[in-house]
């Protein structure tokens, strides 16, 4: 992740739930609730510290870092990579990943049909997408509403 980037799930504020609950598995219960219930944006350093992303570097270095990381696998037999990947994925399956993903997808559909979500989405033709997203994010001063370059 670029060290000046932000990540989060703003739709949890009004129009959805994540269809994959990897946040719980990666961040633990406390941080997953903190960020998914609020929809707050997470800066790169925090995302790295809490385990949401594995690496942070300047944007100009990302391609080189990805290439270098990928090259670490070139001498490992594909069957060895596949077996280890299946074992890791199975551990997550045993913790309920598939069920959580199915429920997340269902709840995402439900969340988009609540009265509040319908009112929010229904205002897009009149106000425009950028305006309704700004109204969602302005109170939190994040995502597109985040002050930049010394703005306050």
Q: Can you annotate each of these PLM segments?
A:
Residues 1-5, 12, 53-102:
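C-terminal long alpha-helix characteristic of the crotonase
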């Amino acid at each position: 992740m670029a060290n000046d980037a932000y990540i989060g799930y703003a739709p949890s504020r009004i129009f959805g739930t994540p269809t994959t609950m990897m946040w719980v598995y990666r961040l633990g219960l406390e941080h997953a609730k903190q960020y998914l219930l609020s929809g707050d944006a997470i800066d790169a350093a925090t995302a790295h510290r809490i385990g949401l992303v594995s690496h942070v570097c300047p944007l100009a270095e990302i391609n080189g870092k990805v290439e270098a990381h990928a090259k670490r696998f070139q001498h490992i037999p594909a069957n060895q990579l596949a077996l280890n990947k299946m074992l890791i994925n199975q551990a997550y399956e045993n913790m309920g990943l598939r069920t959580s993903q199915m429920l997340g997808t269902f709840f995402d559909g439900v969340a988009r049909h609540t009265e509040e979500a319908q009112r929010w989405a229904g205002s897009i033709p009149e106000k425009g997408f950028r305006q309704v997203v700004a109204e969602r994010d302005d109170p939190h001063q994040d995502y597109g509403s985040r002050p930049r370059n010394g703005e306050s």
